[in-house]
Amino acid sequence: MRTAGSAMRTATVVAAGLVLLAGCGGGASGGKGGDGKGDVAGKGERPGGPARGASATTHLKNIPEVGAALRARIPAGSRQVVAVYGKGVNSAEATVVLYDKGAKGWDRKGSWAAHNGRRGWTVDHHEGDKRSPVGVFPLTDAGGVLQDPGANLPYTHSSAFTPPSYWSKNTRHDFDYVVAINYNRVKGTSPLDPTRPQGQSKGGGVWLHLDHGSGTSACVSVPKAGMQALLRALDPARHPVVVMGDAAHLAG
């Protein structure tokens, strides 16, 4: 259980928030906008996601379609994994699946159609390349324009998440809810913290956030109901991580 002090952190520098927003969503255009309709337990999956029957959704020895190299990067203490299955190295379409580890193995808890960087994936992400970074990254901090929906992760509620007015209208609600992906950031800080330990050129501000119907600058976007489900499920005591990439890189 979070203390009152850790449950909500207020952003103090709006300018810093704009730097992070520019790194996350940019002026994405097109798409139908997030409709808030999440899918669970395999419904609504996009091509590229796991295609398995109900018998293969519980008591799994390993996270499906993730090879030994990335499995080795999942911390031993991690008992929650958000797997992002990209359709292809140059595709913006993906499927997000939440796995939770119990006494008998990994259980699939939910699945949502998603988007990643509009140019696909990369193992060497740089600012402005419009590709999402491949890898395994902790999930420690959350926030958004909207009030905390019942998150277990520390949640920063702030209007500083609001996209700039000059962005496309279909992106206006992208950051109603976000979970920071710990790529080139300092864990334990607000998602709005602009600090980039590897330098500005390596990009940053990579988040899970609401979907607007098309690719992002580097983030992974999920329907509103999916973001609400993730925020309520992800538990810092279970050391959640995201494992993300296209099919070839995930399996490699």
Region spans (language model):
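Extracellularly exposed regions in secreted/surface proteins, prominently low-complexity, repeat-rich
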Residues: 206-252
